[in-house]
Amino acid sequence: MRKILLIKRGAIGDLLMATPLIRQLKQKLNCQLDIVVGKAASCALINNPYLDRQIILNDADFTLKGAPRLARGLFALRGKYDYVLVLDKHWYFNLMAHLVGGKVIGYTRSNFAHRLLIAAVDYVDITRYHGLYYLDLLQVSGLAAADYHDIELDLCITISDKLAVEAFILERKLNNFTVVINSGGNNAYETKGLRMLPTAKILALLNGLLEQGKTVLLAGSKIDFQNNQAYLQQLNYPERLINLAGKFNLAASSYLIGRSEHFYTTDCGAMHLGVARQIGERMTA
C-alpha cells in the first residue's frame, strides 16, 4: 500500500477546498493518507473519513521563526512515506518536505522551485479556484487521473453537532433566522482583518436586516466575539440580534448556516462552510 503525506498549514477555507483532493486520493489509490496541519485550522478535517491521521503542529511552527520546530517534526516522519504532496505554495515548504523523504510534489512560481520537486504544478493564475489547483497535484503525480467535476467539499457534521444547534433553536424559539459572519484576515498567520466588511458597511447590512423584522445571528469564532459585541452596542435590537461567536464548533456552525434562511459572509473560511452545506442562492458572500 502506498503511503502519502499531505502538508498544509491552514487556513480553514483552504483545507475545506482540499477535501476533494483528499477524497480522490483515498478512493482512487486506497493508500495510507496522513496530513501535517496547523492546529488552528485542523478543525476543518475532524472526522474526515478519508484521512488516516492528522499530525497537528503548533501554528507558530510554520513561520520562519518556527522553522527548527517544523524541521524536527517533519524529520521525525522520515522514511515513512512514499509521496509528499505540499499544498502550500511557497518554495520553502517544498524544501522542508524533503526532510520527510519520499517523492515531493508541489507548486512552483520559479525555476528554483522546480528543482525541488519530482512533479510540479505551476501556480500562475491566482483567480483560479484553489480546489482545482489542489486536484492538479494528483493529476501531475501520475498516480491517478484527477476528476475535476468531483469537487464537493467534505465537512463531517455529527449528531451531537446537530443536537447542539437544534437545542439552541428550540430554547430561543427561533423559526426563521439569518446568519451573518463578518470575518476574514484574522487567524494564526494574519491579524489585520483585511477581508472583513468595514464597520460602517456591516452596521448598514445588519440594520437593514433588522428593520425588515429579521432575527440575525452573528456567528463566527472566538476571535470575532468582541467585534460582534460592538455591533450589538450600536444597534438596539437585543431580542433579534444575537452574538454567537465562539458558541459552536466549526461543524455545528456549518449546520447552523444550513438551517438559516439566508447567510451573509465575507471571503473567509465561513464562506466555504456555506459551500459545503450547498445552500446556493441562500448565501451572499
Please report, for each region that a protein language model flagged, where it lies by residue:
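Catalytic machinery of carbohydrate-active enzymes
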Residues: 1-285
